[in-house]
């Protein structure tokens, strides 16, 4: 036997035995039907940037037909079977409607799916019960979307689930008790939704639960004792709900609890001292409840691990216990609105060497707090709030032992201070200072403007700025000032030019002073930063600058001496929401061109010299308009209010973190409005507030019926004009109306009976018109005084004299209402019909040109029949 065949034989045996080692992997590892399902799922949604500022790339970009889905971003397959087991599309910029039946049916092709993560996209829709069929899921994360509706109870069928994240959606209804079936669950996050009702008692079966987050919902009831028996809990977050009752005294059973958060609820009773004795506790948030009694820390372990203790905004009373000194690791302490009823002994804080944030506002102390002593007591303090207390400021020529300059934020608002604290000069790290609502006189120190980012000096007696001429020559390459509040002082002269150096300004409020001269044109330098500019109630003259500030959200120059026209450059203020030029000398026509500002919500032109007619225009978001006390004239077009859709219905606010008021956390818009016959100052403007004031002009003709489209209107004032004709019955559609004033016009006819059905209408004035007939009998009308109807010789009925002859209601009233509603519908639809009219005229021309004889024959016969029928009916 030759050597060569034997060699090949042994090589064959070798490779046969080790073929598994050298086997080439399959080219297509994933299953074709799963790949197709993923591609179909991808095509259901659009991809739009940006999305939540997520740094991750677009995962579905790698999803292409013909490629191996197991190699796609966000997809994980089982190495042996090729089955897709994980789908992670977090931060994938997916936009669209999640069709539960179709989308979930696609996902049901993945029989062994363990992880489904669709968090932080822009997905809307509801979750159907078929999600319960994904029986192998261990992790489900739908956080950071716009999902709504109820949670399907079938989620309780996902018995292998260990993590369920539904944070930051719009889910509502009650939390299904079936979630108590998830016995392997360790992480449950239902926070920031709209859940109502109580915490299900079935949660007591979640024995493996470590983290429970239910904050920012509308949950109510008591904290179930079953939850306190979940001994593996390390975090409980219940903040910002409507929970009531007392905190359970046996909370010590949660022996490994690290964080307990229940802020912003309605809990009552005392704080159980046992809470502070849990060795592992590091964070306690109980602020803004109705807790009462004295504060007791019990037998605190030494050293305590507690880092944050927030108890402010309750009804706690008595002295601060000396045992607080055992909280040696404390970084943040909030005892604001604590009714101390005595002297604050800051020596009890001497052992809190690491304390960085101390909040003692409105402590109801019987003695004065020495600011110098407090600052000297704490070596690591970064933030200090003593607002609403009596604070002593001692300005000495020298400080023997100046405190360390570590304070970054200091709040001394409303502390009765009469002179500026010199000790603040040593605080080189200070970036936020609030000394508003005091009695400080003199000049504002120049160094503040070069160091601070936030300065609130409003409601004092300042008269100027220290060494302003020197400051104006100072070169500040990177000015830090972002928020400057200087309202309600005694500043005078021109607005100092150093303001122009503060090019990082976001908010500038110099309202209610005595500034004069022109508005500095340099405000245009803030074109990319300035959001809110308030110069109300000064003596500023000249015209509004023509510079463009694209970032501006609110502009208030009311109650000055400005003249000229509104600058047409305002058309480029694309982010403008509020424009208030009330009580100036502006002489211009109505600014129809402002309709291009898509975000404009408040427009106040009151008490100027505006003139001319009002034509139909489009204001999609306008909710408050006041053009009273001007010289507008002419008739209002019948479709005047058709495209004022911001008052037709309120937009659904998808962002629940938005403020209820116009403005931001630092600044809120304000204005003066005629309401119920009186001038009312709105210190804050509710976002749901709507008002229309056209009073004190020279309008004539009929009140447009399209006014009935403004169904969200709260205030309507058309008084002191020359309106004629009947009050439109369409006003009966103004279901939210609280104040109605049509006095001092030339209106005739009867007051529409439909107005009697407006249950919120608390104030009305129909006086000084030519109205006749019986006053409507609604409850709101009966409570009005006779002065609301005076100088209408034809009116009768309560609260006026009884009508001598009571006429049966004519059917014309009902028909007029029906006709009014039909007119409003046709007016609102007219915009969409315009292209159809053009098309119809074109087709008509073709028909008439090609078939005139038969067309006129048919038309003539039909018209003849109608005329004969009409004559016979009349005879």
From Swiss-Prot:
Keywords: Cell membrane, Glycoprotein, Leucine-rich repeat, Membrane, Receptor, Repeat, Signal, Transmembrane, Transmembrane helix. Residues 24-822 are extracellular. It is a single-pass type I membrane protein. Glycans are attached at residues 65, 103, 133, 146, 181, 229, 250, 299, 364, 395, 411, 490, 514, 587, 633, 717, 757, 765. Gene3D superfamilies: Ribonuclease Inhibitor (3.80.10.10). The chain crosses the membrane at residues 823-843. Residues 844-875 are cytoplasmic. Residues 1-23 form the signal peptide. It holds the Pfam family LRRNT_2. This is Receptor-like protein 33. The gene is RLP33.
């Amino acid at each position: 036997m030759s050597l060569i065949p034997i060699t090949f034989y042994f090589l064959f045996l070798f490779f046969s035995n080790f073929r598994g080692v050298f086997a080439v992997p399959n080219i297509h590892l994933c299953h074709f039907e799963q790949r197709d399902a993923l591609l179909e799922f991808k095509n259901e949604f659009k991809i739009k940037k940006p999305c939540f500022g997520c740094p991750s790339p677009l995962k579905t970009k790698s999803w292409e037909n013909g490629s191996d889905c197991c190699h796609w971003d966000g997809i994980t397959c089982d190495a042996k079977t090729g089955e897709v087991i994980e789908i992670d599309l977090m931060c994938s910029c997916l936009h669209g409607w999640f069709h539960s039946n179709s989308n979930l049916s696609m996902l049901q092709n993945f029989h062994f799916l363990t992880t489904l993560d669709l968090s932080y996209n822009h997905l809307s829709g509801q979750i159907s019960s078929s999600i319960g069929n994904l029986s192998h899921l261990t992790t489900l994360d739908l956080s950071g979307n716009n999902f709504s509706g109820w949670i399907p109870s079938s989620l309780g069928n996902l018995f292998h689930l260990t993590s369920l994240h539904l944070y930051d959606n719009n889910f509502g209804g009650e939390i299904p008790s079936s979630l108590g079936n998830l016995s392997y669950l360790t992480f449950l996050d239902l926070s920031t939704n709209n859940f109502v009702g109580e915490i299900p008692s079935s949660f007591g079966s979640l024995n493996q639960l470590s983290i429970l987050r239910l904050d920012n919902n509308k949950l109510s009831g008591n904290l179930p004792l079953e939850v306190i028996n979940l001994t593996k809990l390390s975090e409980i977050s219940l903040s910002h709900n409507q929970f009531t009752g007392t905190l359970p005294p046996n909370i010590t059973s949660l022996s490994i609890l690290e964080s307990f958060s229940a802020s912003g609820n309605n809990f009552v009773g005392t704080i159980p001292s046992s809470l502070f004795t849990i060795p592992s506790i590091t964070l306690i948030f109980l602020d803004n409840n109705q807790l009462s009694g004295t504060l007791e820390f019990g037998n605190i372990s030494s050293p305590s691990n507690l880092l944050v203790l927030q108890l402010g905004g309750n009804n706690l009373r008595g002295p601060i216990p000396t045992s607080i000194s055992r909280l040696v690791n404390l970084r943040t302490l909030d005892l604001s609105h604590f009714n101390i009823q005595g002297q604050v002994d800051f020596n009890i804080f001497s052992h809190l060497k690491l304390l960085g944030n101390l909040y003692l506002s409105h402590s109801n102390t019987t003695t004065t707090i020495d600011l110098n002593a407090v600052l000297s007591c704490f070596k690591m303090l970064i933030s200090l709030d003593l607002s609403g207390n009596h604070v002593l400021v001692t300005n000495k020529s020298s400080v023997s032992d100046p405190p360390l300059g570590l304070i970054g934020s200091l709040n001394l608002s409303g502390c009765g201070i009469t002179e500026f604290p010199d000790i603040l000069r040593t605080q080189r790290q200070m970036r936020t200072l609030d000394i508003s609502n005091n009695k400080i006189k003199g000049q504002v120190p120049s160094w503040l403007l070069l160091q601070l980012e936030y300065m609130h000096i409003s409601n004092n007696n300042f008269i100027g700025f220290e060494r302003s001429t020197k400051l104006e020559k100072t070169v500040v390459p990177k000015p830090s000032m972002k928020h400057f509040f200087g309202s309600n002082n005694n500043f005078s002269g021109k607005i100092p030019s150093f303001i122009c150096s503060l090019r990082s300004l976001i908010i500038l409020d110099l309202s209610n002073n005595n500034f004069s001269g022109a508005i500095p044109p340099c405000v245009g330098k803030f074109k990319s930063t300035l959001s809110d500019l308030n110069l109300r109630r000064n003596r500023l003259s000249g015209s509004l600058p023509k510079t463009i500030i694209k970032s501006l959200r609110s502009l208030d120059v009311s109650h000055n001496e400005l003249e000229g026209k509104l600058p047409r450059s305002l058309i480029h203020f694309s982010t403008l929401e509020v424009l208030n030029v009330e009580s100036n000398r502006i002489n211009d026509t109505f600014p129809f061109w402002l309709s291009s500002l898509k975000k404009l919500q408040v427009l106040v032109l009151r008490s100027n010299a505006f003139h001319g007619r009002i034509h139909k225009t489009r204001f999609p978001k306008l909710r408050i308009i006041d053009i009273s006390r001007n010289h507008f004239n002419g008739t209002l077009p019948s479709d005047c209010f058709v495209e004022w859709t911001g008052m037709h219905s309120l937009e659904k606010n998808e962002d629940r973190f938005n403020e209820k008021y116009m403005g931001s956390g630092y600044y809120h818009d304000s204005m003066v409005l005629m309401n119920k016959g009186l001038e009312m100052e709105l210190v804050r403007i509710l976002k749901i507030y709507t008002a229309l004031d056209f009073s004190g002009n020279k309008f004539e003709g009929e009140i447009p019926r399209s006014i009935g489209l403004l169904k969200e209107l709260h205030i309507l004032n058309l008084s002191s004009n020359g309106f004629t004709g009947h009050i439109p019955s369409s006003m009966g559609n103004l279901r939210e109306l609280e104040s109605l004033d049509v006095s001092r016009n030339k209106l005739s006819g009867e007051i529409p009976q439909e107005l009697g059905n407006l249950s919120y209408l608390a104030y009305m004035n129909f006086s000084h018109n030519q109205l006749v007939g019986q006053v409507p009998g609604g409850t709101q009308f009966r409570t009005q005084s006779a002065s609301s109807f005076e100088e209408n010789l034809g009116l009768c009925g309560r609260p006026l004299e009884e009508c001598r002859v009571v006429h049966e209601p004519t059917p014309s009233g009902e028909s007029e209402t029906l006709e009014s509603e039909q007119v409003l519908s046709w007016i609102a639809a007219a915009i969409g019909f315009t292209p159809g009219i053009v098309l119809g005229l074109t087709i008509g021309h073709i028909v008439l040109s090609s078939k005139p004889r038969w067309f006129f024959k048919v038309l003539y016969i039909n018209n003849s029949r109608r005329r004969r029928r009409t004559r016979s009916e009349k005879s």
